[in-house]
């Protein structure tokens, strides 16, 4: 990770900044995913939040659903500030998240990515994730159905 970037687990005091990031990045996303109260509820349901910061500003975040009994983690949400898209910042956060697998004792990390999100799909490929397949037209985004790619990474 470049020295001007910091990656860390988000705390309750970061939830308002996380809400602000989601509001900037997701104009057409479900309202609840933009809400600090909803994020707080997710924390109580064994979700962890990670962020990439530059000069104290949250630029990229990921929400992980941890399932320790089944030894897996799912990246359920990944967002980049609109002004910082295309700079490959997600690469560093995914790298850090892979390192969290050992902390939680997880063997598999998986996620679904919009098929048209080329940069994020490339990021997961670069990190050794395997493309398990594409779920065709299975997600409503804005006012249209979109396909989702399913990626997984198994700890060796």
Task: Outline where the language-model segments fall.
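A short beta-loop-alpha structural element at the N-terminal edge
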Residues: 4-18
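A conserved beta-strand-loop-helix scaffold within acyl/acetyltransferase catalytic domains
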Residues: 19-82
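Short hydrophobic/aromatic beta-strand or adjacent loop that forms the aromatic wall/cage
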Residues: 47, 146-150
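Long, contiguous binding/interaction regions
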Residues: 73, 116, 123
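Conserved acetyl-CoA-binding loop-helix of GNAT-fold acetyltransferases
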Residues: 80, 86-101, 126
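Conserved GNAT acetyl-CoA-binding A-motif
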Residues: 101-114
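Conserved catalytic-core motifs of GNAT/GCN5-like acyltransferases
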Residues: 110-112, 128-147
């Amino acid at each position: 990770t470049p020295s001007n970037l910091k990656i860390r687990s988000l705390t309750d005091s970061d939830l308002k900044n996380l809400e602000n990031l989601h509001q900037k990045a997701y104009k057409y996303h479900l309202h609840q995913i933009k809400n600090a109260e909803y994020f707080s509820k997710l924390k109580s349901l064994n979700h962890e939040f990670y962020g990439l910061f530059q000069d104290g500003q949250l630029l990229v975040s990921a929400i992980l659903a941890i399932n320790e009994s089944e030894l897996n983690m799912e990246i359920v949400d990944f967002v980049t500030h609109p002004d910082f898209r295309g700079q490959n910042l997600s690469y560093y956060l995914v790298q850090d998240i892979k390192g969290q697998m050992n902390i939680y004792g997880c063997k598999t990390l998986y996620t679904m990515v919009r098929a048209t999100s080329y940069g994020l799909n490339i990021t997961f490929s670069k990190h050794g994730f395997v493309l398990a397949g594409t779920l065709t037209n299975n997600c409503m985004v804005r006012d249209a159905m979109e396909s989702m790619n399913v990626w997984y990474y198994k700890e060796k």
